[in-house]
Regions:
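A conserved helix-loop-beta module that forms one wall/lid of the active-site cleft
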Residues: 1-28
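Protein kinase-like catalytic core scaffold
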Residues: 16, 51, 73-74, 117, ...
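Conserved protein-kinase catalytic-loop segment immediately C-terminal to the catalytic Asp
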Residues: 17, 122-123
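C-terminal active-site "lid" helix and adjoining low-complexity regulatory extension at the edge
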Residues: 96, 110, 123-164
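Residue-level signal for tight coil/turn positions that link beta-strands
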Residues: 13, 69-70, 125
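Coil-to-beta-strand transition motifs
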Residues: 60, 114-116, 125-128
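Phosphate-binding site of ATP-dependent enzymes
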Residues: 22, 27-112
Length: 164
């Protein structure tokens, strides 16, 4: 049985993050502190499918992890919640990542049977929190991703999973 929108909204605990269901590199992300702010934002996003998430205070950085056939690429990006935050990525080497971040990232791929995906996490006072798993993330500007994508396509062709 489906809950009515008002029933769902009445269960919200603020603050929450509201964001587009579709990736826009943080263009459509807002922190909402109360029901009045949510009601005020609704007309602006009327045609946009949205996701509401519990707000997790963080250190101000999003950790972006991209995986192509078990190869991890990583970067830090300023959270889109900070006014005027640059949208550029600051690349990280996998050596800079804690081992548990790498292992959980690869485990996510196994769990969802993904060979190409992205994981976004935040560093909070209580530790890292995964906030997104993207089954088809953008790789623009990710150093080395183009070569890894070519290798994946070649491997899928060899496995007979794609044909010309």
């Amino acid at each position: 049985h489906l809950l009515k929108q008002q029933d769902v909204l009445s269960t919200l605990s603020f603050p929450v993050i509201i964001k587009s269901r579709y990736s826009h590199r943080g263009d459509l992300v807002s922190k909402i502190d109360n029901r009045e702010e949510l009601d005020a934002l609704a007309p602006q996003w009327r045609q946009e499918p949205v996701i509401l998430q519990e707000f997790s205070p963080s250190d101000g950085w999003d950790i972006k992890l991209w995986v192509i056939d078990q190869q991890i690429f990583a970067a830090r990006r300023r959270t889109p919640l900070e006014p005027g935050a640059p949208k550029e990525d600051f690349p990280l080497t996998t050596d800079e990542l804690p081992e548990d971040w790498k292992s959980i990232t690869l485990e996510i791929g196994k769990t969802f049977n993904l060979r190409l995906y992205g994981v976004d996490l935040l560093m909070t006072d209580s530790g890292p929190v995964i906030v997104d798993v993207n089954s088809f993330p953008g790789f623009r500007g990710v150093q080395g991703a183009d070569d890894a994508l070519v290798r994946l396509v070649e491997r899928l062709g060899e496995e007979g999973k794609i044909t010309a």
